[in-house]
């Protein structure tokens, strides 16, 4: 996989997200039935030039799903990589979640209760110093982490004001993708070099954050990184306590190799300082 220089790979907007699965029909049903994603067109073969860009041989197929204005594509490759690591937690440096904004956390939680939880004790309301949101983390059948996010009354960001869920959906769309990083300051500088602007940093800690992450003594720096287009955005999670463990380098056909797809000048792949994979499309 290639890494482009900042001049070649300015990240101007998030075009979508790609999840890797070992069972495309099963994962499609989960996102449809649990979260109300809608199928976006027919299943398609992944183009040969994209497979080459990903460093993969053989063939692959893709199903695009939509929630609000955001698109998530589910990829399954003939030659599958590693399953999602069983021993990881929210601080692990391969951790990456999609944050789904909901209007009614109670109804959303009832819908996903059968999924594998990350959080303990159900949805958590974080203190005002951590944004004051209601949040709940869980996993899809392949192990990909997800977060339900409900903004408090009067504090919904402008991008989400006036948004309502379509019939049968619990989600309004995807607010961000969050990635765990070893050094939030270094990652901040790295992503700024690709055109992203940091937002207000918070230090999330306390019992609510501990229950949300199912980790003891949590202290995590949260840094939103905004593309010029606005939402959705990237979020950096720099865990001070506990320190996140690194895993083997991700390959594009590993189930944990979630890719944020960005609009850019030309097709390329980018690995960040911790090995998270980004795909750039022109």
Stretches found by the model and what they are:
Residues 1-28, 34, 41, 95-100, ...:
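N-terminal beta-strand motif that seeds the catalytic metal site of vicinal oxygen chelate
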Residues 3, 48-51, 81-86, 155-162, ...:
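A short, acidic/glycine-rich surface segment
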Residues 9, 20-70, 126-131, 137, ...:
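Core segments of cupin and vicinal oxygen chelate
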Residues 13-22, 59-79, 84-112, 134-139, ...:
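Vicinal oxygen chelate
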Residues 29-34, 38-45, 90-94, 104-117, ...:
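Extended intrinsically disordered, low-complexity coil regions enriched in Ser, Thr, Gly, Ala
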Residues 74-76, 136-163:
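Short, structured interface segments
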Residues 119-127:
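Short, basic/aromatic recognition patches
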